[in-house]
Amino acid sequence: MIECWLVSKDGKHGRIRLPHAETVVIGRGPETQITDKKCSRHQVQLMADCNKGYVKVKQLGTNPTSIDGVDIGKEQKVDLKPGHTLHIVNNLYPYVIEFLEGATNPHAKRENENRSSSKRTQENSLNEGTGTSMKLMKKESNISPSSSSGKNSSCSTEEKYNAQEVKSQGHWSQGLKASMQDPTMQVFKDDKVVVIKDKYPKARYHWLVLPWQSIANLKVLRAEHLELVQHMHAVGQKIAKEHSDSKCAPFQLGYHAIPSMSHVHLHVISQDFDSPCLKNKKHWNSFTTDYFLESQAMIEMIKTHGKVNVKDGVSELLKTPLMCHICRKEQANMPQLKEHLKKHWPT
């Protein structure tokens, strides 16, 4: 049975178990060893879903609780996934969550944790000893939504990043890291990036460009990543260009402000949004509001500021009314919106 644990990144105290589907409230107190008066004794409410691999976080206190630097908002709820960092208050007291196989007694649980720690140490040693050279992979021709790469070569740079991700491929929110290594999903790869088909495409054409380097989210990006994100953009443009014609909707390249999956990825998506996987308002607004950060704009942001600025409260954009991205007419529901889109992009 999978168990969820809240782990202090400061290492100030032992991990806190979050039972499946049970409410746990933490804040200032002996359990967390937080003495900061700006932190309420009931600062956050946590509820783990061990089946889906995330924790629902609700801010109860007055001062801000945040995930990866983005404030949640009082009485608001946000999903915390493995690989992301929860700061209890005022960007202080960082925590992460881990999902582990449950044990039958506390002694066995400690052994599980020790084995996990030992495994991480061994993987770190492996990473340090891995080389950094890599051969450039030739892109397979005739990329299409249903096509896949027919070749899979091993190369040391790719293996280095693979080793870093092995321990986290078991949870759904880490699914991109597993798909990156799946030859049937790959349509292109080189020494810096891999392109895969989106497993649940939200349009006729929908790919993801991912760096081999492990980068959790946009907040981590800095000036030293500029060359990498420019390369990701160039690769995305190349793939889009191969499918651009008079009958095809234009493409958009960009990133979700707060991605649902861990590991930075660039969306290359056609603007027809003709897909059965596009099911709800959240899906739609994640691509048609400012929640979707255009790739070129993000590159300019890194050039100018040396980082990516994600606006506070950006998640609220996912709740805005459904509106056609072409004519800006508001639609009552998803079926009506999908029918309306056919006027712009006939099948």
UniProtKB/Swiss-Prot annotation:
It catalyses: a 5'-end adenosine-5'-diphospho-5'-2'-deoxyribonucleoside-DNA + H2O = a 5'-end 5'-phospho-2'-deoxyribonucleoside-DNA + AMP + 2 H(+); a 5'-end adenosine-5'-diphospho-5'-ribonucleoside-2'-deoxyribonucleotide-DNA + H2O = a 5'-end 5'-phospho-ribonucleoside-2'-deoxyribonucleotide-DNA + AMP + 2 H(+); a 3'-end 2'-deoxyribonucleotide-3'-diphospho-5'-guanosine-DNA + H2O = a 3'-end 2'-deoxyribonucleotide 3'-phosphate-DNA + GMP + 2 H(+). Its EC number is 3.6.1.71, 3.6.1.72. GO terms for cellular component: nucleolus; nucleoplasm. One of its GO terms (biological process) is DNA repair. The histidine triad, also called HIT motif, forms part of the binding loop for the alpha-phosphate of purine mononucleotide. The HIT domain is required for enzymatic activity. This is Aprataxin. DNA-binding protein involved in single-strand DNA break repair, double-strand DNA break repair and base excision repair. Resolves abortive DNA ligation intermediates formed either at base excision sites, or when DNA ligases attempt to repair non-ligatable breaks induced by reactive oxygen species. Catalyzes the release of adenylate groups covalently linked to 5'-phosphate termini, resulting in the production of 5'-phosphate termini that can be efficiently rejoined. Residues 173-278 form the HIT domain. Residues 23-72 form the FHA-like domain. The record marks 179, 256, 267, 282 as: Interaction with DNA substrate. It is found in: Nucleus, Nucleoplasm; Nucleus, Nucleolus. A zinc finger (C2H2-type) spans 322-344. GO terms for molecular function: DNA 5'-adenosine monophosphate hydrolase activity; DNA binding; DNA-3'-diphospho-5'-guanosine diphosphatase; zinc ion binding. CDD domains: aprataxin_related, FHA_APTX. The active site is at 265 (tele-amp-histidine intermediate).
